[in-house]
């Protein structure tokens, strides 16, 4: 049989978001949204002092193009790693502090990329905006 999902059937899409912070200020937040023409996501984890931020963000188009950027920002600066199957990208010409991996990625969208383990609870939808 067929699985009926009204949000996808009408093209409205679906989204989730979360935001957490512990008593000393360590935090994580993110969102994931998908619809008939693709989707986007973002995740970030950081320490209470602002010394380290680790995260990822990305997008997927309906035609199978996909870009996922993982990053780390610390005392050494901002360093990103870009994974994409987009046409026209040349991995031999990386921008400063960025590594572009022009690898064949799956064309099926399975949701966001998680750069690590998530410990905690998702915040209800009505919790603030990012």
UniProtKB/Swiss-Prot annotation:
Any S-S bridges, and between which cysteines? none
Q: Specify the Chitin-binding type R&R domain's residue ranges.
A: 24-90
Q: In which domain of life is the source organism classified? A: Eukaryota
Quick check: keyword Nucleotide-binding in the entry?
A: no
A Pfam cross-reference name: Chitin_bind_4
Q: Mind listing the UniProt keywords for this protein, alphabetically? A: Cuticle
Gene Ontology CC annotation, any one: chitin-based extracellular matrix
The GO molecular function terms of this record are:
structural constituent of chitin-based larval cuticle
- Which PANTHER family does the record associate with it? CUTICLE PROTEIN, CUTICULAR PROTEIN 47EF, ISOFORM C-RELATED
Q: What is this protein called?
A: Cuticle protein 14 isoform a
Protein's organism: Limulus polyphemus
């Amino acid at each position: 049989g067929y699985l009926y999902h009204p949000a996808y059937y009408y093209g409205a899409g679906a989204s989730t978001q979360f935001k957490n912070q512990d008593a000393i200020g360590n935090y994580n937040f993110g969102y994931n949204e998908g619809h008939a023409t693709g989707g986007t996501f973002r995740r970030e984890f950081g320490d209470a002092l602002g010394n380290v931020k680790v995260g990822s963000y990305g997008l997927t188009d309906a035609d199978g193009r996909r870009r996922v950027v993982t990053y780390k920002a610390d005392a050494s600066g901002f360093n990103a790693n870009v994974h994409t199957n987009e046409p026209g990208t040349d991995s031999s010409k990386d921008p400063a502090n960025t590594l572009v991996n022009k690898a064949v990625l799956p064309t099926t969208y399975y949701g966001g990329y998680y750069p690590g383990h998530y410990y905690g609870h998702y915040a209800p939808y009505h919790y603030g905006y990012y």
